[in-house]
Amino acid sequence: MVEALLSGIVLGLIPITLAGLFVTAYLQYRRGDQLDL
């Protein structure tokens, strides 16, 4: 029961974490491109 709950949380968090990393990397790329860093 606990393992299923933990695996569900992990499987739910992985796409959110990946999406957050992609968004932050994209925003940093856009910001760096605009500020010409």
From Swiss-Prot:
Q: What are the GO MF terms of this UniProt record?
A: electron transporter, transferring electrons within cytochrome b6/f complex of photosystem II activity
Looking up InterPro entries in the UniProt record yields: Cyt_6/f_cplx_su5, Cyt_6/f_cplx_su5_sf
Question: What keywords tag this UniProt record?
Answer: Chloroplast, Electron transport, Membrane, Photosynthesis, Plastid, Thylakoid, Transmembrane, Transmembrane helix, Transport
Which GO cellular component terms are attached? Answer: chloroplast thylakoid membrane; cytochrome b6f complex
Highest taxon, organism lineage: Eukaryota
The protein's topology relative to the membrane is: Single-pass membrane protein
Q: Which Pfam families match?
A: PetG
Q: Which GO terms describe its biological process?
A: cytochrome complex assembly; photosynthesis
Q: How does it assemble?
A: The 4 large subunits of the cytochrome b6-f complex are cytochrome b6, subunit IV (17 kDa polypeptide, PetD), cytochrome f and the Rieske protein, while the 4 small subunits are PetG, PetL, PetM and PetN. The complex functions as a dimer.
Task: Describe the family membership recorded for this protein in Swiss-Prot or TrEMBL.
Answer: Belongs to the PetG family.
Q: What does this protein do?
A: Component of the cytochrome b6-f complex, which mediates electron transfer between photosystem II (PSII) and photosystem I (PSI), cyclic electron flow around PSI, and state transitions. PetG is required for either the stability or assembly of the cytochrome b6-f complex.
Which NCBIfam families does the annotation name?
A: PRK00665.1
Name of the molecule in the record: Cytochrome b6-f complex subunit 5
Native species of this protein?
Physcomitrium patens
